[in-house]
A protein has these predicted regions:
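Gly/Gly-Pro- and Ser/Thr-rich, intrinsically disordered tail segments characteristic of DNA damage-repair
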Residues: 1-101, 105-108, 160
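DNA-contacting surface of Y-family translesion DNA polymerases
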Residues: 75, 80-179
Length: 179
């Protein structure tokens, strides 16, 4: 266990991304994916936030309804007509009313507003298996225009193999050798 807490780990990753790549990232931490997504949007830029189920009423419910994940413009307009203005208003609305006006999407929004999400974050990592591809070119490439089609073809090949195996990439790396 490399980190003493999830927040410490997230801060280290966030700082390393900035150091290596020069851009900022926000990190949301939770036991549920929708809450991690919501937490990552709390305050920007370059922040780490938690949003665990027990924190939902304090941290998420006061937010405007339009900030809820998957609440699009049309859904928000419908909810405002129902006098639902905050995520807390939505969380405390009878889901049957939401289904009447927004169909199954209303139920899903109600679940999200209450921090309910059946796609929990997996804490046990599966054994990493690499999927890669490489090529040796007959001559050195010197421009981005020459290199980009080669990289796209290699990436497409790896993507096909990942999809066929039912896997997703956890890391992408590119190695370039030249003489």
């Amino acid at each position: 266990d490399r980190f003493t807490s999830p927040v410490e780990g997230a801060n280290e990753i966030k700082d390393e991304v900035y150091k290596r790549f020069g851009f900022t990232v926000n990190v949301g931490i939770s036991s549920r994916k929708v809450l991690a997504k919501m937490a990552s949007d709390f305050e920007k830029p370059n922040k780490v936030h938690t949003l665990f189920p027990e924190e939902v009423p304090v941290k998420m419910w006061p937010l405007p309804i339009g900030e809820l994940f998957m609440a699009g413009r049309s859904s928000v307009e419908t909810m405002k007509k129902l006098e639902i203005y905050t995520i807390g208003d939505l969380a405390n609305t009878d889901p049957a009313i939401l289904e009447l006006h927004l169909k199954s999407h209303g139920r899903k929004l109600w679940e999200f507003a209450n921090g309910l999400d059946d796609s929990e974050v997996e804490s046990v990592r599966a054994e990493a298996k690499g999927v890669g591809n490489s090529t040796t070119l007959p001559k050195d490439l010197t421009t981005e225009e020459e290199a980009l089609p080669v990289l796209k073809n290699l990436a497409a090949s790896v993507g096909r193999r990942l999809r066929k195996a039912g896997q997703k990439a956890g890391m992408v790396s590119v190695e370039i050798k030249y003489h």
